[in-house]
């Protein structure tokens, strides 16, 4: 990231859906998302953020949607130092996601296991059903069309 953002959309990004991800930001990230163009034209439009888990462990991260059009935020969970949902969000969640070991580091894909929800996590049965549900989660576990927030359907690695 060039300006300290976790997600950057610069230019004419159109019709994208950012769905069922787990984002963990440390003190190095200033904004969760930055959307802008230098001249205000050809901006990002028709973007949906749905069922994502945003954990901010550091700065008071925000969304900076400078000149985007038709951004939709649905059923995202916010936890950490920044717990304020995006403006106009439908069904936001602000609760501890109860992850296995958030903030831990590791090597490669094994580090992802620290960000898996525990069995009591509120992310496991929340969220908006996606229009086209993924067949599997990050680890290859079947989603069986269930709704969930974040990248993992449950704590079991396949």
Report the location of each language-model feature.
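Predominantly extracellular beta-rich ligand-binding scaffolds that present long acidic/polar faces
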Residues: 1-114
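Surface beta-loop-beta hairpin patches that serve as ligand-binding interfaces in beta-rich domains
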Residues: 111-114, 118-158
């Amino acid at each position: 990231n060039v300006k300290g953002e976790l997600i950057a959309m610069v230019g004419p990004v159109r019709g994208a859906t950012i769905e069922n991800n787990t984002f963990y930001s440390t003190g190095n990230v200033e904004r969760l998302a930055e959307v802008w163009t230098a001249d205000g034209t050809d901006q990002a439009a028709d973007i949906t953020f749905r069922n994502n888990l945003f954990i901010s462990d550091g700065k008071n991260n925000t969304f900076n949607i400078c000149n985007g059009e038709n951004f939709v935020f649905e059923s995202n969970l916010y936890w950490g130092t920044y717990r304020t949902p995006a403006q106009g969000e439908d069904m936001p969640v602000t609760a501890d996601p109860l992850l296995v070991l958030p903030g831990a580091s590791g090597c490669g894909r094994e580090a992802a296991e620290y960000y898996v929800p525990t069995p009591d996590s509120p992310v496991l049965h929340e969220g908006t059903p996606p229009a086209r549900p993924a067949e599997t989660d990050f680890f290859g576990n079947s989603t069986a069309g269930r709704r969930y927030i974040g990248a993992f359907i449950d704590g079991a690695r396949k």
